[in-house]
Amino acid sequence: MKAIIFLFAVLTVVAIIIPIISGEPNAGPHAASIDLNEIMKKITPDLLKMLDDIKTKIQG
């Protein structure tokens, strides 16, 4: 059950963060695919650290 909640939280965070970083505040997740590779290169290290923090909080 925790894994499902964790996955949902991660997907939600990604769907919200990517359009903001891509510079389109009113854009939904669908609009982020234009420069998705560039964006992912920038945020992947931060995202991995954030996911690790979330995982450690969930695990105790």
Curated annotation (Swiss-Prot):
Expressed by the venom gland. The keyword Secreted applies. Residues 24-33 form a propeptide. Residues 1-23 form the signal peptide. It is found in: Secreted. GO terms for molecular function: toxin activity. GO terms for cellular component: extracellular region. Its main location: secreted. The modification Glutamine amide is found at Q59. Keywords: Amidation, Neurotoxin, Secreted, Signal, Toxin. Belongs to the formicidae venom clade 2 family. Toxin that causes a rapid and irreversible paralysis when intrathoracically injected into insects (blowflies). Does not cause spontaneous nocifensive behaviors by intraplantar injection in mice. This is Myrmicitoxin(1)-Pr4c.
